[in-house]
């Protein structure tokens, strides 16, 4: 008797490419360039076939139509290159399954034009879609407050119409984050970028952040934790490009996060940021600081003051210098803010970075470290990561008693390589 071998199952990306009805050439190009990356990352994080299929389908049907024209003309502030899409993977020392996440700024053909100079309409369209999806626990009350406080209104848009905004790095007003959960559901996060609002209203970034936190207090009272954060940032200086984040859940359960940055990338600055200038001291913070030093040494970040050019890095000869970034997470009823630091690895040798992360994962007891290097290489077939410096974007680090080390790695998330070409070569096309 002849036994026939069962044909291998079609991978979710290939199956969906045949199954879904992509409505335009733009969607088809974006799907090949970003959907394929999402597929590789989901597979590398050991998502099941069913989980991969569900999340890829969500991406194709809900997000992909809101990437707008290809190639894009509006540059998003969520990535150094201006790409409106960024993938990351979260690792937890306690052994929880890996979680793939999407950072996303919706775009359309009018983004950046006089009809929508600051790309506000697409975000509202996506919010409407999310409202209709019946996501468990989904709540947009904080979004409404953040949009009111942190984004420009019609009158302000008109006042800015003739303003010189330079490279436009602060044009983005809002963005979304999506955690692709193992049960097939998604968790949604929101982001607001108040820099433009500060410019037109004359309010400082400190005033802008304090105003929103105070207005949110009846819904989610984080005033005690914010007081510590604000005192530290008043002492050291609020970054003019700071931004804000929250969860789309019932407000009292939401985390509030204030993101800020510095051009100083030194161990002394990291330790200061971690403890808010010694304002937060306890055994958990001390243990986290030890792990933070371990990771800092393994990644081998260039140590010193960085010359930051506020512009996108989307060509071979554009500036790759990237600032230190961090956020302070605040929860209702908890007087102590939690620090998460984002190592600015964009601009560092990619293989050096991924080797350092792999070794760190092994040292903290996660077997993912053994296969990490090869998995990251699989995202970029045909590219020698020992010769590149821009495919790894950020490595973030936090530490709690519950999760242990909480580490996320962020990647350039398109098959396009914008850094193959110089600005002059691009202008001649």
Swiss-Prot record:
Pathway: Alkaloid biosynthesis
Chain positions of site Required for regioselectivity: 103
Keyword annotations: Prenyltransferase, Transferase
Disulfide bonds: none
InterPro entries attached to this UniProt entry: Aro_prenylTrfase (IPR033964), Aro_prenylTrfase_DMATS (IPR017795), DMATS-type_fun (IPR012148)
Alphabetical GO biological process terms: alkaloid metabolic process
Keyword Transcription regulation: no
GO molecular function: prenyltransferase activity
Description of the deletion phenotype: Abolishes the production of okaramine B and leads to the accumulation of cyclo(L-Trp-L-Trp).
Binding of dimethylallyl diphosphate, residues: 101, 189, 191, 257, 259, 342, 406, 410
Pfam family, one: Trp_DMAT
Catalytic activity: cyclo(L-Trp-L-Trp) + 2 dimethylallyl diphosphate = cyclo(N(8)-(alpha,alpha-dimethylallyl)-L-Trp-6a-(alpha,alpha-dimethylallyl)-L-Trp) + 2 diphosphate
UniProt xrefs under NCBIfam families: arom_pren_DMATS (TIGR03429)
Function: Prenyltransferase; part of the gene cluster that mediates the biosynthesis of okaramine B, a prenylated indole alkaloid that possesses an unusual octacyclic ring system, including a four-membered azetidine ring and an eight-membered azocine ring, and that exhibits insecticidal activity against silkworm larvae.
Family the UniProt entry places it in: Belongs to the tryptophan dimethylallyltransferase family.
UniProt-recorded name of the protein: Prenyltransferase okaC
Organism: Penicillium ochrochloron
Gene this protein is translated from: okaC
């Amino acid at each position: 008797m002849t036994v026939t071998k069962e044909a291998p199952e079609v991978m979710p990306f290939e199956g969906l490419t045949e199954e879904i009805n992509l409505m335009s050439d733009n969607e088809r190009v974006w799907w090949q360039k970003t959907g394929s990356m999402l597929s590789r990352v989901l597979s590398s994080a050991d998502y099941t076939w069913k989980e991969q299929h569900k999340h890829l389908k969500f991406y194709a049907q809900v997000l992909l139509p809101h990437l707008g024209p290809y190639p894009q003309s509006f540059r998003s502030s969520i990535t150094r290159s201006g790409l409106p899409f960024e993938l990351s993977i979260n690792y937890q020392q306690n052994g929880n399954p890996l979680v793939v996440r999407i950072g996303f700024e919706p775009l359309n053909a009018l983004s950046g034009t006089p009809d929508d100079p600051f790309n506000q309409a697409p975000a509202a369209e996506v919010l409407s879609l999310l409202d209709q999806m019946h996501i468990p626990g989904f709540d947009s009350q904080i979004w409404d407050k953040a949009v009111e406080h942190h984004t420009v209104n019609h009158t302000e848009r008109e006042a800015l119409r003739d303003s010189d905004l330079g490279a436009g790095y602060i044009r983005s007003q809002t963005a979304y984050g999506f955690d692709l959960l193992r049960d097939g559901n998604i968790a949604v996060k929101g982001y607001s970028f108040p820099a433009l609002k500060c410019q037109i209203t004359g309010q400082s970034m400190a005033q802008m952040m304090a105003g929103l936190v105070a207005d949110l207090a009846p819904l989610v009272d984080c005033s005690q934790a914010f007081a510590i954060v604000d005192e530290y940032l008043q002492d050291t200086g609020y970054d003019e490009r700071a931004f804000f984040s929250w969860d789309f859940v019932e407000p009292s359960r939401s985390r509030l996060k204030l993101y800020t940055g510095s051009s100083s990338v030194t161990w002394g600055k990291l330790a200061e940021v971690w403890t808010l200038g010694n304002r937060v001291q306890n055994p958990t913070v001390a243990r986290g600081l030890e792990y933070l030093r371990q990771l800092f040494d393994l990644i081998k970040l260039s140590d010193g003051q960085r010359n930051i050019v506020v512009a996108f890095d989307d060509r071979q000869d554009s500036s790759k210098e990237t600032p230190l970034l961090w956020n302070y997470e605040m929860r209702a009823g908890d007087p102590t803010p939690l620090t998460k630091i984002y190592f600015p690895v964009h601009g560092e040798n990619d293989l050096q970075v991924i080797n350092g992360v792999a070794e760190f994962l092994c040292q903290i007891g996660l077997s993912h470290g053994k296969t990490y290097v090869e998995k990251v290489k699989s995202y970029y077939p045909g590219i020698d990561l020992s010769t590149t410096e821009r495919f790894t974007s950020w490595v973030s680090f936090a530490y709690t008693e519950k999760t242990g080390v909480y580490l996320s790695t962020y990647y350039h998330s398109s098959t396009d390589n914008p850094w193959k070409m110089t600005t002059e070569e691009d202008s001649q096309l």
